[in-house]
Amino acid sequence: MDKSKQLFRKSKGSFRRRLPPIGSGDRIDYRNMSLISRFISEQGKILSRRVNRLTLKQQRLITIAIKQARILFSLPFLNNEKQFERTESIPRPTGPRSRNK
């Protein structure tokens, strides 16, 4: 084979297959908070199926379980614990307001 063609050939490397995040024994239920909390972001949003690496059926069941837990108040709708901090305060003018025309 030509040297120029050899440079563009892809090497066939091995890849590690990831384990599914939900085991066969795990029960998807609104009471199983340890399982549900893995699929919620820090802000309290439900993570997408691509991020979770779930099947369509599992994602649907997780979504329903999260929504049931939110309705029964075992899970908050929003996570407001994160406080926003200002790094630098901007001084505000204290005098009368001026109009820009």
Swiss-Prot record:
Region ranges (Disordered): 1-23
Annotated keywords: Chloroplast, Plastid, Ribonucleoprotein, Ribosomal protein, RNA-binding, rRNA-binding
Keyword flag Ribosomal protein: yes
Principal cellular location given in the protein's record: plastid
Alphabetized HAMAP family for the sequence: Ribosomal_bS18 (MF_00270)
Subunit structure: Part of the 30S ribosomal subunit.
Name of protein: Small ribosomal subunit protein bS18c
Gene: rps18
